[in-house]
């Protein structure tokens, strides 16, 4: 895989809880209309968050839980743990299964990290979510349906790249994840028009690739 090739993630485990135990539902603080849960793990957290947002657009589901695991998929407690756990909540098993199906399709064929170099040791994500669903719009505090540039890279690359992205287009920083995240990366959500978000993603990509080519730039 040379630089810019996609790094395709995998779903590592998936189950449906058709009817959640009442006591467990209270512990999870589920609203009364959530009776079923879809559980899914995958080996790329940010790709899975994007997929979860897609599920909210294709099925009557909500993301009731989503957390990354510490240190990434390579250091998980089991092969099925992956890098992230998502719980989709819905009124019945059919809606939850539809949401999980949407997530699997997105994980396998949608947004993906890319290699920044031929050595395949630096990965980044620069993806335009053209129309946010309920999950990402709520997370970022933007209006439902607003476009978003979803940017992730290692700490220095992300810091340099986010600045470059914001200088390149008419975009607003709505979420910043300083390093280190649970997986030792850094991230930002930018919002603006689709064209502006695309320009921001391109500038972020160029910045990450520039560091990959020449890591130590002396003044």
Swiss-Prot record:
<feature type="site" description="Important for gating">
    <location>
        <position position="70"/>
    </location>
</feature>
<dbReference type="GO" id="GO:0006091">
    <property type="term" value="P:generation of precursor metabolites and energy"/>
</dbReference>
<feature type="domain" description="BMC circularly permuted 1">
    <location>
        <begin position="1"/>
        <end position="113"/>
    </location>
</feature>
<dbReference type="InterPro" id="IPR000249">
    <property type="entry name" value="BMC_dom"/>
</dbReference>
<dbReference type="GO" id="GO:0031471">
    <property type="term" value="C:ethanolamine degradation polyhedral organelle"/>
</dbReference>
<protein>
    <recommendedName>
        <fullName>Bacterial microcompartment shell protein EutL</fullName>
    </recommendedName>
</protein>
<comment type="function">
    <text>The ethanolamine (EA) catabolic bacterial microcompartment (BMC) probably concentrates low levels of ethanolamine catabolic enzymes, concentrates volatile reaction intermediates, keeps the level of toxic acetaldehyde low, generates enough acetyl-CoA to support cell growth, and maintains a pool of free coenzyme A (CoA) and NAD. Deletion of BMC genes (eutK, eutL, eutM) restores growth of eutD deletions, suggesting there are dedicated pools of coenzyme A (CoA) and NAD in the BMC.</text>
</comment>
<dbReference type="InterPro" id="IPR030983">
    <property type="entry name" value="EutL"/>
</dbReference>
<comment type="function">
    <text>A component of the bacterial microcompartment (BMC) shell dedicated to ethanolamine degradation. Forms a hexagonal trimer with 3 small channels and a large central pore that has been seen in both open and closed forms and is probably used for gated transport into and out of the BMC. Ethanolamine-binding by the small channels has been hypothesized to stabilize the EutL central pore in a closed (non-transporting) state. An open pore is thought to be large enough to transport ATP and/or cobalamin. Expression of eutK, eutL, eutM, eutN, eutS (eutSMNLK) in E.coli leads to formation of a single BMC.</text>
</comment>
<feature type="binding site">
    <location>
        <position position="45"/>
    </location>
    <ligand>
        <name>ethanolamine 1</name>
    </ligand>
</feature>
<dbReference type="GO" id="GO:0046336">
    <property type="term" value="P:ethanolamine catabolic process"/>
</dbReference>
<comment type="pathway">
    <text>Amine and polyamine degradation; ethanolamine degradation.</text>
</comment>
<feature type="binding site">
    <location>
        <position position="113"/>
    </location>
    <ligand>
        <name>ethanolamine 1</name>
    </ligand>
</feature>
<comment type="similarity">
    <text>Belongs to the EutL/PduB family.</text>
</comment>
<dbReference type="InterPro" id="IPR009193">
    <property type="entry name" value="EutL_PduB"/>
</dbReference>
<feature type="binding site">
    <location>
        <position position="83"/>
    </location>
    <ligand>
        <name>ethanolamine 1</name>
    </ligand>
</feature>
<dbReference type="GO" id="GO:0005198">
    <property type="term" value="F:structural molecule activity"/>
</dbReference>
<dbReference type="InterPro" id="IPR044870">
    <property type="entry name" value="BMC_CP"/>
</dbReference>
<feature type="binding site">
    <location>
        <begin position="183"/>
        <end position="185"/>
    </location>
    <ligand>
        <name>ethanolamine 1</name>
    </ligand>
</feature>
<dbReference type="Pfam" id="PF00936">
    <property type="entry name" value="BMC"/>
</dbReference>
<keyword id="KW-0843">Virulence</keyword>
<feature type="site" description="Important for gating">
    <location>
        <position position="184"/>
    </location>
</feature>
<keyword id="KW-1283">Bacterial microcompartment</keyword>
<dbReference type="InterPro" id="IPR037233">
    <property type="entry name" value="CcmK-like_sf"/>
</dbReference>
<feature type="binding site">
    <location>
        <position position="46"/>
    </location>
    <ligand>
        <name>ethanolamine 2</name>
    </ligand>
</feature>
<feature type="domain" description="BMC circularly permuted 2">
    <location>
        <begin position="114"/>
        <end position="215"/>
    </location>
</feature>
<comment type="subunit">
    <text>Homotrimerizes to form a pseudohexamer.</text>
</comment>
